[in-house]
Amino acid sequence: MILAAFVGIPAALAIWVAILSKWQRGIYMLVLFVPFGSGLAVFMRPNPAGVLLKDFLFVLPIYAVFVLLHMRDFRQARIPSPISLMFVAFAALVLLQMFNPGVQNVIAGAIGIKVWLLYIPLAYLASAMILRAEDLITLLRLSTAVALIPLVVGLLQFLMSATVGYEETMTMFYGNEAAAVTQNFAKFQMGADFYRIPSTFSFVAQYSGYALMMLAITYMHQSVDPNMGWRLFAKIMTVLAFVAAILSGARTNFVFAPALLLVILFLDAKLSRMAIWLLLGPVIMIMTLQTAGLDVFAVADKTEGLVSNYGSDLVIPDLINSLVNYPLGKGVGSNTGGARNIMSVAELAALPHPVEGYYAKAIIELGVPGLVVLLMILFSIGVYALGIHRTTKEPMKRSCTAAITGFIIIMAVHSFKGWQIELDPINVWYWLLVGILFRLPELRFDTVVEARRQAEAVKKGRQRPTRRQRTAQRKRVPRYR
């Protein structure tokens, strides 16, 4: 404990000083931290401070510095006024539900408010921070580079689980917390064992969501970076993220990983990329499953059953039950995992059984009015995204709008079953991407395009000319006697 304080306090002070000197640094540091924050919180158990590290080290200091010293930068944000008004209405409903008689634990209610609202302002900060194409490229480079660690760790955990043993591998990584981060070593039989993999996170949903999200981010990166080496790295990371998403242990990624890529490729409408992924995507997926020892036909059969069963047995019944039983809501925190963890047995007994779907959760905590405003926000963001993409003509910019729009669409569909929008790290990245989306129409990629052209010209100049090129060159050069 003393050693942790001896190291942690100076580190926290250094982070806060860096944010104080330039608030944008806080966003970059936050992006580097989120792939490891929840995993670090696991090692800090039973100390509850671990789950708040991200907020107290980065999010709250960024907000404080921005509001107190840099509010003039708020004028740079490009979030449309109708969406901002919806945010205000949603925040009012969330705060109002704090006074719901169903909220018996004030701390649990505060956690519920934090989960619903804390990260939405990141959309404004991202929109105010990304003023040039170079700013976006810097953010994408950091995100792609740091993603190598959790993706490789996740694949290593799957490989070791298949060879050394699942419990042995997870215990090696997480010690006494191994059972907690793997849902008591849960696995599925699909010709071979299909393991729940947490990687550097605290459970599989976070890691699977991260791998899924990185498909959109690496697609953007490979489309806009002027450096050929970075573009190649981003392409490799796209494939790595796809494989990691498939082997994360989340069966829903058998559907959502290919679906996200298909939506992005369809929106981007680059025929060469579409052809490559339509040809190689199924091959990569089949090879990944076979290499892992999984039966392709068993996976397809179970995935089909999973989709139909989730709809008929879980998603629709949860929505209907929530609408019928809790039209006015039970109060914030009543269906939030972090809030329920600190409640007493008596408090939990008075609450409904928790549901997985984001929309059903909204009904339970915020009632029908909360669900309506939430759907208005998500639907409006999606409509704006499609509109921005439709009017964007510049190829680099269009690839970015395609990736973000595709991600927004998939998250909206995913939210019928899961809570990804409120889980690390998507609770941060969803709003960052929304902010970037609304900034994109004003970004100019002229310098990036010119830098790429110059790099390609230099590359061609260094290449040894072919025999035909040398012959043609000799014919063009006049000879004097």
Predicted regions and their residues:
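Long extracytoplasmic/lumenal interhelical loops at the membrane interface
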Residues: F36-G37, R45, A292-L366, A385-T392
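Membrane-interface helix-loop-helix junctions at transmembrane boundaries of multi-pass membrane enzymes
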Residues: V17-I27, V67-L85, Y219-I236, K270-A275, ...
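Transmembrane alpha-helices of multi-pass inner-membrane enzymes
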Residues: V65, A216, L261, R273, ...
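A conserved mid-to-late transmembrane alpha helix and its immediate loop/hinge
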Residues: Y195-A205, A349-A385
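A membrane-periplasm/extracellular boundary helix in multi-pass inner-membrane enzymes
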Residues: V152, L156-V164, V243-S248, L265-V307, ...
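N-terminal hydrophobic segments of proteins, predominantly signal-anchor/transmembrane helices
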Residues: L20-R45, D55-I120, M411
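Alpha-helical transmembrane segments of multi-pass inner-membrane proteins
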Residues: A12-A14, A91, L95-F99, L140-E168, ...
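Hydrophobic transmembrane alpha-helices and their immediate junctions
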Residues: A241, P258, L262, L366-A412
